[in-house]
Amino acid sequence: MAKRGARNGTKDDGGWGKLIRDVVVILLLVLGIHSCVAKPFYIPSDSMMPVLRNGDRLIVSKYPYGWSYSSVSFHLAPKVDGRIFGTLPERGDIVVLEHPLTRIDYIKRVIGLPGDTIALRNGELSINGKPVKREVQPMLSIPVDPNLPGPDSSLFRFVSRDARGEPVLELPIVRETLPGGATFDTIDMGPGYPTDDYGPVTVPANHLFLMGDNRDGSADSRVDASQKGLGGPVPFDAIAGRAEIISFSTDGTAEWYNPLSWLGALRPNRAGTDLRPERQGK
């Protein structure tokens, strides 16, 4: 008896072989989209507070600065010099990068471009010898939840109780405006932190100086690589993409085995938050 599919002279393409091929094609498509267009990103710490919170999920675009080895998702590409269609970020952009040594993903804000001289004195930032504009803002009150403050956070000292007795973070906010007009909020915990004094350091060609918005709780370009910092300005090739928007945010109460808990764990008013900084004069 002839096998099914052979009666009209065609080869049977069914079975495990076709399934495996389909899965491989899908995986390659996902990898291509993640590497060339956009990918999701999870915030695991408080180093970019107040704009980003532990538990936020973001969309990171891959094309604004061109492509390099760091653009390839899952760290599959070998480290090679060079960037295709490379375009430098603007000061104030939030970028995802591969740590130059460990290849772990970090997310920080671009503060200095090639040729800029960066210095901090008593926590006050200057670029090219000119102090960055700082404006003290009202205290920011954020509800505490299982994801906030994050593990090993520097922010636990700011936990207090609101009028209803609920735990909240009361954060000291300073708004900075960089050369070029990018303006955004930072957390300034006060004097006495090791990263309050730094430099001056001139950013080399094809490098960027990156900092977290939680200025006294961020391992960034000011912090030695032995302390999980970036160890100075970062090669432009290490930049993987630009943070664009918050897709959703969770408070840490969801249980994976209970789908009904997933909706209740969503933080209100976080989805859709634009992560591009305001730019004065534009």
Which role does the model predict for each range below?
Residues 2-17, 36-37, 41-42, 47-282:
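Soluble "head" domains of membrane/secretory-pathway proteins
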Residues 18-36:
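Hydrophobic membrane-insertion alpha-helices, especially the h-region
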